[in-house]
Amino acid sequence: MPRIVLLHDAADAAGRPDSSDTLLEAQAIATALATLGYETATLPVGLDLAALKRSLRDIAPHAVFNLVESIEGQGRLLNLVPTLLESLGVPFTGCSAHAVATTSHKLVAKKLLRQAEIATPAVLGQPGDGPWIVKSVFEHASLGLDDTSVVKEPAAAARILEARRAEFGGDWFAERYVPGRELNVAIIASPTGPRVLPVAELKFEGYPEDKPAIISYAAKWDVDSFEYRHTVRSFDVEPELAARAERLALACWDLFALDGYARVDYRVDASGCLFVLEVNANPCLSPDAGFAAALERSGIGYGDAIGWLIEDARRRAHARAA
């Protein structure tokens, strides 16, 4: 029976819900792989990459399912895992080390988007006025995002940047906050090529006018919060806007040389202009996450999608070796 190794973040000692979710994601995928006839083994990934290398050589897996979103809480190290897997010649799901590196550094990604003439919010210090939103350069899962992240003046943004560095460490930046709607588009490598899944909108229902309409940390992870209960996913996006979002997602897929699966996040301003916020080369595949919801909406079974990703990993590894 072919064996698949699932790599995931080592458990966070602080028990953050975004870290714990990676374990649930791995369990769901292992269950899906078992129904497809695969044996599975799961390995937590820390900074001891030599130990990981030995384990992978001992197991000699049919393929690796790479679910690592950070290494010991550091998103800046995200590309180390695909780099190791590429050096070993092991088939693995998801994007290449280069694609992960260029998309996980949000400022590098924004530079490449601008060079390709794809709209993305201006960074503080570039021409343009606020308001501004403060974000982590490397971390995902909306870490550090709350109502105080959105400010009107550069001086206020500077204070929040300093506060976030003190609280979370790492690098932070401020970009122009785009009032409006929030969309995302998931793409999966199907047997016939990249397939765009239905465009999703995250609606901020019942938000007070003075409350920033953002996907905050609470909106993603705190099930008892106002933000979580009032941020609702919908697939009823008007066809013209959805078509533009789909085309732009495919342009990002090509620009960053993405593989396997990915997600592009947008804001839509009052004039209907789409701004790319982030290109996520390793989005969450938990059954209750947006990617799985988009699969269901498109009529693709969760297990079928997991199987596609293994097949894609094997196909790409064979092409690299040829």
Question: What feature does the model see in each segment?
Answer:
Residues 1-9, 56-58, 100-181, 190-192:
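Active-site nucleotide/adenylate-binding loops and adjacent lid/helix of ATP-dependent enzymes
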Residues 1-91, 97-98, 103-104, 108, ...:
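ATP-binding N-terminal substructure of ATP-dependent carboxylate-amine bond-forming enzymes
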Residues 4, 65, 133, 186-189, ...:
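A short beta-strand motif that forms the metal-chelation/ATP-contact edge
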Residues 32-35, 139-141, 220-229:
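Short, basic/glycine-rich phosphate-binding loops at helix/coil junctions
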Residues 40, 63, 91-92, 120, ...:
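Hydrophobic beta-strand scaffold residues
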Residues 81, 236-322:
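ATP-dependent carboxylate activation and anion-phosphoryl transfer catalytic cores
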Residues 154-247, 270-275:
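Phosphate-binding site of ATP-dependent enzymes
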